[in-house]
Amino acid sequence: MASSPRAFALVFFAIAAVGCTQLTTADDAAPPVWQKAHATFYGGADASGTMGGGCGYGDLYSQGYGTRNAALSTALFNDGASCGQCYKIACDRKRAPQWCKPGVTVTITATNFCPPNWDLPSDNGGWCNPPRPHFDMAQPAWEKIGIYSAGIIPVIYQRVPCIKKGGVRFTINGHDYFNLVLVTNVATTGSIKSMDIMGSNSTDWMPMVRNWGANWHSLSYLTGQTLSFRVTNMDGQTLVFKNIVPSGWKFGQTFTSKLQFK
């Protein structure tokens, strides 16, 4: 006996509803994307050897980055654009169970650059050679996930939001006609896509250029002026830090805002 149009429609919509429900559930339950890399360690047991570095953060203790930090290989460093980004890392027990501490992850901040070593092969000492994704981690962070005697371990990693206390900070270095601004304590993406500066003698924003790492520069003469910054993070969120730097500022000073990326 042939089905009625109404019965067919009810069956169709019931199947469609089940399909939609299954699709939504699958999407919601999808695990985060983990990528493969390797990790070594440096800097000593107290991570004192990780200070400074290719991002320009200087004293990582006073800047709030502590010992959970890492130098990134060329494939991850992105010419300094990755400075400040946060990564959750776990030892890959599927590839080296004997060298992994099970059930443990550590979240680190990118604070340095791990340069290539072209004198050594990529699989035997030249760990940071392109195109290898590699983390040279501060020793205390590395030992959270790996057995010390291994020296190098396979890892899985993923980008995660950076969690920070307080507002974005700006440190002004350089000299007249060369204003070098270090941006630190950046939440969410951790890294900056673009930055503009405006002095109190002007109403125009002037684009700044990434000089190295997390340092941005302007060649304008701004000494004695109140300064404002317009900062866009890697997600495209823009914050305006109006008059964050008073007119009596000096090179070497740090100014903490009340604004933070969310």
UniProtKB/Swiss-Prot annotation:
Instruction: Enumerate the Gene Ontology biological process terms.
Output: plant-type cell wall loosening
Q: Which InterPro entries match?
A: Expan_Lol_pI (IPR007118), Expansin (IPR002963), Expansin/allergen_DPBB_dom (IPR007112), Expansin_CBD (IPR007117), Expansin_CBD_sf (IPR036749), RlpA-like_DPBB (IPR009009), RlpA-like_sf (IPR036908)
Domain Expansin-like EG45, residue spans: 52-167
Domain Expansin-like CBD, by residue range, is 177-257
**This protein's UniProt keywords:** Cell wall, Cell wall biogenesis/degradation, Glycoprotein, Membrane, Secreted, Signal
Topology in membrane: Peripheral membrane protein
Residue positions with a glycan:
N201
| Record's GO cellular component terms | extracellular region; membrane
Out of the domains of life, which is the source? Answer: Eukaryota
Q: Which SMART domains match?
A: DPBB_1
Task: Please list which residues make up the signal peptide.
Answer: 1-20
Q: State the Gene3D superfamilies in the record.
A: Expansin, cellulose-binding-like domain, RlpA-like domain
Mainly resides where?
A: secreted
Instruction: Report the family membership.
Output: Belongs to the expansin family. Expansin A subfamily.
Tell me the protein's name.
Expansin-A14
Q: Which organism is it from?
A: Oryza sativa subsp. japonica (Rice)
